[in-house]
Swiss-Prot record:
Pfam families: TPT (PF03151). It is found in: Membrane. Belongs to the TPT transporter family. The modification Phosphoserine is found at residues 348, 352. One of its GO terms (biological process) is phosphoenolpyruvate transmembrane import into Golgi lumen. One of its GO terms (cellular component) is endoplasmic reticulum. It is a multi-pass membrane protein. This is Putative transporter C83.11. Its main location: membrane. The modification Phosphotyrosine is found at residue 355. GO terms for molecular function: antiporter activity; phosphoenolpyruvate transmembrane transporter activity; triose-phosphate transmembrane transporter activity.
Length: 449
């Protein structure tokens, strides 16, 4: 037991374990991409490879869960809930589209070029949030997109004359994965709001099993229509062995990504993902002995600089968003407390028209701090808070035909908190008392908003 705890401490809490997990993640990702390119050099089957990748991940996840339950006494395959199916089904569509177009791009252009184009995902993310959701980014974020875009353009300048279709496939794949990240978060939030708040949790292997399994099932008709059994390699052939290696490495790549994301922060994970992309580009260039000129090398270097600057800007934005969330949380608690105080305030039997408007009746606000904040409001400095009985008509809505509430004439400082504004409801007309002077609230405490 002590040895197991020590091993767990080394693997998940110390820098050595973190670096080891990152290195394994990088290697598995590089093996997946290089074996994919090797398979496409022998047999162009992008749909079949994507289909088998989902199947391998689901199969190996199920095997690991059964082995864990049988020999280690851990959690086995859990029954899927509506929440899991609701979230994995739409996301599987994005997964299928992104992987298929990525495989199509790999069949036509080098792996390094595909991943260089995929490095444009921050650019598409910022543009989507800016124009679709009106999100405002910092100047540092926009500045980081300049070397990123310029670097990708330089790195792909040679491929523009070679195969423009492959670059187009890579761009489509990048846009699909960006859409998955944007709408996937909204799908998760909507699913949580409609969930039954069950306490059932799913481990990483179960999540991999259901996400890949749903994508595998959904892709069956697409695979049968596009390629089918004719593109399956013979058992024992080099392509068949590469498919096995590709499926294993793809499974380890996914499980290592889940593990890293669960033990480090999102910002640290994004930096590790940046290094992984650069690692895959360098390994693919060395593995396939790809000729790279000075322009392409400079483009890859500028792309790495742009990604690093973008991650630094995200770290600053994350800090600002945390402060905003803390402020919103405090404001929400204050609003709930205000509503409770209003409901518990003793009433005279007639409900005030300001009930539910977050104005505390025991505090009389200054009009110069309230009226400018109310858009399309009929209230003016000459229409509320007075000790006079003269009234002026203001349009309003009222359910009773005739309701009257008298106002007290004694406005001493001893009963300042018991004052009520006189009002009269007469057939959809709200009449407020006229003040004796322009501002009748100099001695009243200011309402802080």
């Amino acid at each position: 037991m002590v040895l197991r705890e020590r091993l767990s401490h080394i693997l998940f809490h110390e820098k050595v374990g973190f670096l080891l997990l990152c290195l394994l993640w990088y290697i598995s990702s590089a093996v997946t991409n290089t074996t994919s390119k090797s398979i496409f050099n022998e047999l162009r089957c992008p749909v079949t490879l994507t289909f088998l990748q989902f199947g391998f991940v689901a199969f190996f996840s199920a095997v690991c869960l059964l082995f864990r339950k049988q020999f280690l006494g851990g959690t086995g395959i859990q029954k899927p809930s509506k929440y899991v199916l609701y979230t994995t089904l739409p996301l599987s569509i994005f997964q299928i589209g992104g992987h298929v177009f990525g495989s199509l791009a790999t069949t036509k252009i080098p792996v390094s070029t595909v991943h260089t184009v995929k490095a444009l995902s921050p650019l598409f993310t910022v543009l989507a949030y800016r124009f679709m959701f009106r999100h405002v980014y910092s100047a540092m974020t926009y500045f980081s997109l300049v070397p990123l875009t310029f670097g990708v353009t330089l790195a792909c300048s040679f491929e523009l004359s070679a195969d423009i279709v492959g670059l187009l496939y890579a761009l489509i794949s990048t846009c699909i994965f960006v859409s998955q990240n944007i709408f996937g978060s909204k799908i998760f939030m909507e699913a949580k709001s409609h969930s039954t708040h069950t306490k059932k949790h799913y481990n990483k292997l179960n999540l991999l099993l259901y996400s890949s399994g749903v994508a595998f099932i959904v892709m069956i008709p697409v695979w049968l229509y596009q390629e089918g059994f004719a593109y399956l390699p013979e058992v024992g052939s080099p392509v068949f062995l590469n498919l096995i290696y590709n499926g294993l490495s793809h499974f380890f790549q996914n499980i290592l990504a889940f593990t890293l994301l669960s033990i480090i922060s999102p910002v640290a994970y994004s930096i590790a993902s940046l290094i992984k992309r650069i690692f895959v580009i360098v390994v693919s260039i060395i593995w396939f002995q790809q000729a790279t000129n000075f322009t392409q090398g400079s483009g890859i270097f500028l792309t790495a600089i742009g990604l690093w600057l973008y991650d630094r800007s995200k770290k600053g934005n994350l800090y600002e968003s945390c402060k905003v969330k803390e402020f919103e949380k405090d404001a929400l608690e204050l609003e709930e407390q205000t509503m409770e105080d209003e409901k518990s305030y003793p009433s005279s039997g007639t409900q005030s028209p300001f009930y539910g408007k977050n104005f505390l009746p025991q505090i009389t606000p200054r009009l110069d701090s309230v009226v400018p904040l109310i858009s399309d409001s009929p209230m003016t400095p000459n229409s509320v808070y007075s000790n006079e009985g003269v009234t002026s008509s203001v349009s309003g809505n009222a359910t009773p035909a005739s309701v009257r509430q008298s106002t007290q004439n004694d406005f001493s400082n001893s009963n300042i908190h018991d004052r009520r504004s006189s009002y009269t409801f007469q057939l959809n007309n709200f009449k407020a008392p006229q003040p004796s002077r322009l501002w009748a609230t100099e001695t009243v405490p200011t309402l802080k908003i």
